[in-house]
Swiss-Prot record:
3-methyl-2-oxobutanoate binds at D42, S43, D81, K110. The active site is at E179 (proton acceptor). It catalyses: 3-methyl-2-oxobutanoate + (6R)-5,10-methylene-5,6,7,8-tetrahydrofolate + H2O = 2-dehydropantoate + (6S)-5,6,7,8-tetrahydrofolate. Pathway: Cofactor biosynthesis; (R)-pantothenate biosynthesis; (R)-pantoate from 3-methyl-2-oxobutanoate: step 1/2. This is 3-methyl-2-oxobutanoate hydroxymethyltransferase. InterPro entries: Pantoate_hydroxy_MeTrfase, Pyrv/PenolPyrv_kinase-like_dom, Pyrv_kinase-like_dom_sf. The lineage of its organism: Bacteria, Pseudomonadati, Pseudomonadota, Gammaproteobacteria, Thiotrichales. SUPFAM superfamilies: Phosphoenolpyruvate/pyruvate domain (SSF51621). Its cofactor is Mg(2+). NCBIfam families: panB, PRK00311.1. GO terms for biological process: pantothenate biosynthetic process. It comes from Francisella tularensis subsp. tularensis (strain SCHU S4 / Schu 4). Keywords: Cytoplasm, Magnesium, Metal-binding, Pantothenate biosynthesis, Transferase. Pfam families: Pantoate_transf.
Amino acid sequence: MKSVLGFKKAKVTEKISMVTCYDYTLAKIINSTDIDCILVGDSGGMVLLGKKNTTYTTLDDMQFMTQAVANGATDKFIVADLPFMSYRQSLETTMQAVMALIQSGAHAIKLEGSSGNLDIIKHIVDSGVPVMGHIGMTPQFINSFGGFKVQGRTEEAAKHLLEEAKLLEQAGCFGIVLECIPANIAKDITQNLDIPTIGIGAGSNTDGQILVLQDMLGMNTDFQPKFVKKYIDGSKLFSDAINTYVKETKANTFPTKEHCYDYC
């Protein structure tokens, strides 16, 4: 999948697979896999840089990560997050941020929420840049939500999510991330849209799934949300490998002859 058209076709043909990525090395690995799309998420501020939450991720951070991923994943469709407040100050500031991410190698951008964003989305799309929406648990609104909490658990909240999704579609979004909402609500939203939905903690009836790469590879031991499936215990694998290297170094069993250069 290398374009927005691929997303639209996948709505009726196959499930869409996405992961986050923030660096060149992992991007190169992903580039050799069957993954459909990469999201350079503002979550990289937390996962890669150790920041408290995504409100601390800057445009400079996003440019750095997007460039790294684009250099490594040359065959993948790349979406990059507009960071906190970069699209809530002025239209000029918004478009400068959009341009920065596209020129860093992204093919599309993603922003959170619908309120106050619809005209912005239309302008970005009219300017030739595809936009992905994001509703439900939107991390940039963590201070309003009072933490990372499931959204849409009441009838009124569920109705609001569906309304948001329809408005984002009408504004021109080519797809929408549904994060941390009940599976039945995500299914209802998906069935009422012509554009694909990508779920994260939203059940199996969305048009696709996305996970933070480090979560699914078992690299984050201090953050294990319910919706994450750990496909390998990466933290243990890496720790064991590093400890083996330390033991061999101290025992002088590394390097061996095969790792040394001969004198000519």
